[in-house]
């Protein structure tokens, strides 16, 4: 049944690879685990360079290096109906899905042209979490073993997927992330009732434990395969639910302490659906608030501040 459903998806789309690329790079633009350049200068055939290579964005390595990544979704098909997401099952948007081989082709061709140094791969939920996570694993496996791609790979783990699939992907990826989506369980229940804190935090804990066990193993056997060597991260939408900045910082602090995350990303809420359950923000997306949260987050990560410290700061 799943195979038939997947076949129907691909037949319905009947799109070229470049058409899929245009749809699925645009669909990935709200994932802020890396930054886009913001430049819109297109190559004209007469001059060197092109600022509009689809889906090319930038992330920063632990040593400060800027890494160019191909940021795409595997699919923007989704069985979930998260109110804040432009790709939810009720949204009237163009749909597309890659195959594992298509992503391998794009990644290798972009790499050969020196557009990118790595891949950032996320996805909507096609048919089921297990089905989607298996497709992602197949993609990573082919990139690493068939195409011998040794570049950086950041992949999203799919909440609700079989832990065995997440583990296998973790031995092929450099970084994994699972979006927390919203700061509190109440917010998640209100705007994404198909998701739960349990299905998000369980794989986050699995990845944390896997990293710790792998680090211990590497101390004994240096040639042991590495599991998510660049660590894990997460993302929260800011402004879609009524939490204040102190509450958000408390959540981030707990994530850093309990799950040893490398990074928490904050995404200013943009109402892309006009859903009645979403707030109307007269001033538009809270971009300054997002910026201030990153500043506070920096104090958490690098200066060992605690969230409660912010309530006592005076000028």
Where are these predicted regions, by residue range?
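Short, surface-exposed basic-aromatic patches at helix termini and helix-loop junctions that form
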Residues: 168-173, 253-257
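Core AdoMet radical
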Residues: 88-103, 110-136, 142-163, 170-219, ...
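Local cysteine-cluster metal-coordination motifs and their immediate loop/turn environment
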Residues: 77-87
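Conserved C-terminal portion of the radical SAM core fold
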Residues: 184, 199-275, 285-308
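Flexible, acidic/Gly-rich N-terminal and inter-domain linker regions that tether
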Residues: 7, 11-77
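Single conserved hydrophobic/aromatic residue that forms the stacking wall/gate
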Residues: 1-10, 312
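Short glycine-enriched loops at secondary-structure junctions
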Residues: 72-76, 173-175, 182, 270
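Short, acidic/polar
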Residues: 107, 162, 166, 245-252
